[in-house]
A protein has these predicted regions:
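Bacterial N-terminal signal peptides
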Residues: 15-25
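Bacterial N-terminal signal peptides that target proteins for export
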Residues: 2-16
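A eukaryotic "domain-start" boundary segment
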Residues: 34-54
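Activation targets extended, charge/polar-rich intrinsically disordered C-terminal tails
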Residues: 151-425
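Glycine-rich catalytic cores of cysteine/serine-nucleophile enzymes that process amide/ester linkages
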Residues: 50-128
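Second-shell loop/turn segments in exported
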Residues: 62-63, 127-136, 155-164
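A structural motif
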Residues: 137-150
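Boundary at the C-terminal end of the N-terminal hydrophobic targeting segment
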Residues: 29-33
Length: 425
């Protein structure tokens, strides 16, 4: 849901890592914004309301992580003077300061202006759907809204703090349309939603399973709270659908169709069974390797590789989540139950696995036994607290993944530690 300035390849890589590690991704238009030569006539009140046309533009999801949720913008056109501006609330610039602010949960976005033809070229080239919806407002209201957009795009007014769910490139146009639509849009969207914020994130990220699981892991129980359709409009597609139903806009007009892109799932995916199989297989392999490590000369090295891989794959996200809770303002990561399943302690399995690659000793095995026993205990606690009425986090799939890993590895190392023929110290 954002547009960005051109950046060097290395900066793009660093930026992607920052986005990947964040609680939630934000969409991207992958376009730079060039200053327009002249202020539009409506910025000075020179356009007549009868000559103005205001539309919502909805861009469908893209194929990369940063554009999975789609994008929204507002279009103002003076049909007599043949002047147009696309107003995009998704502008930001990649630099080191931005990455630091993003990591701390304080990302500054701004409202930018762009030429319509250039905007259409960029999104069309990406193969994304583009839909126009002309707002059915009076000439006086169109003039007032156009003037407001020009005023909002001034350097002193354009900035805001981005929030993926509460304040983004779709919620800002939603609020503007509702303001000049005399509250009709909010009234239309006041009914309860049948899904949670987590459900929607799962739907939109299903096409990227690794990203989907990471985002699901990083979100806490705040995304389970009851919401209305108004809250769902952090998604551009929801805003477009509800605007059409409100009577505030003409029927949607598709100006570019999506190219070879699967439709967004209507229901959130069900991962519990698949993740349980992955977790059971991972833990089962570890248990089997601990059994072989008793007598097979090369088995401890394989066990060390297993611990290195599991420690990194599970431990790094656990460390990121712990840091987000302790040191940042990513409130959707606070008090996350998933830290009972995976946390910085998991990462300690990686260096201990490296030790096993070169030396089998009781001290290393004792540390791994204590590590996985602790994680097995906290995982069982995470399962048992589900009976409590104030525990609402929907992390069943992650429980299904992590619980068998932690329990089976704890069992394997406990049995291995009891082997009387292991070398010391």
């Amino acid at each position: 849901m954002m547009m960005k300035d051109r950046v060097a390849p290395m900066t793009r890589t660093l930026a992607f890592v920052a986005l990947w590690s964040l609680a939630l991704g934000v969409g991207s238009a992958r376009a730079s914004s060039k200053p327009l030569a002249e202020a539009p006539p409506w910025s000075q009140g020179e356009s007549a309301g009868e000559d103005l046309r205001v539309s919502l533009i909805t861009f469908g999801p893209g194929s990369d992580v940063a554009s999975l949720f789609g994008h929204s913008a507002l279009l103002v056109e003076d049909t007599r003077r043949e002047v147009s501006r696309v107003y995009n609330y998704g502008m930001f610039s990649f630099d080191r300061a931005l990455l630091a602010r993003y990591a701390m949960g304080r990302l500054s976005f701004w409202l930018g202006e762009a030429a319509l033809d250039r905007t259409l070229r960029i999104y069309s080239k990406q193969g994304r759907e583009i839909v126009f919806q002309e707002l059915l407002l009076s000439p006086e209201t169109r003039k007032a809204m156009a003037g407001y957009m020009a005023w909002s795009a001034r350097p002193e007014n354009r900035g805001y703090l981005y929030d993926h769910f509460l304040d983004n490139c779709a919620t800002r146009p939603r609020d503007v349309i509702d303001r000049f639509g005399e509250g009709r849009l909010r009234q239309q969207m006041a009914r309860p939603s049948r899904m949670t914020l987590r459900d929607h994130v799962r739907r939109y990220t299903e096409v990227r399973p690794g990203v989907a699981i990471l985002f699901d892991f990083l979100m806490n129980s705040d995304v389970e709270r009851p919401i209305t359709v108004w809250d769902e409009a952090f998604l551009p597609a929801v805003l477009s659908t509800e605007l059409a139903a409100s009577g505030l806009a003409a029927p949607p007009r598709v100006v570019h169709e999506a190219v070879a892109r699967p439709p967004i799932a209507q229901e959130p995916p069900r991962w519990l069974g698949r993740l349980f199989l992955i977790g059971a297989a991972t833990g089962g392999i570890g248990l089997w390797l601990t059994m072989r490590a008793r007598r097979r000369p090369g088995a401890p090295r394989l066990l060390g590789l297993h611990q290195l891989a599991v420690g990194l794959i599970l431990g790094v996200p656990g460390l990121v989540l712990a840091l987000m809770w302790a040191f940042t303002e990513h409130r959707f990561a606070y008090a996350n139950e998933n830290l009972l399943l995976v946390n910085p302690l998991t990462l300690a399995a990686a260096p201990l696995g490296v030790v096993l690659l070169f030396k089998r000793c009781r001290r290393t095995l004792a540390l791994l036994t204590a590590l996985w026993s602790c994680l097995a205990f906290t995982s069982v606690v995470a399962l048992l607290i589900k009976v409590l009425p104030f525990v609402h986090q929907d992390n069943g799939p992650l429980l299904a993944l992590a619980l068998p890993v932690n329990v089976l590895l704890a069992l394997g190392f406990i049995l291995l530690r009891r082997d009387p023929v292991l070398p010391g110290p």
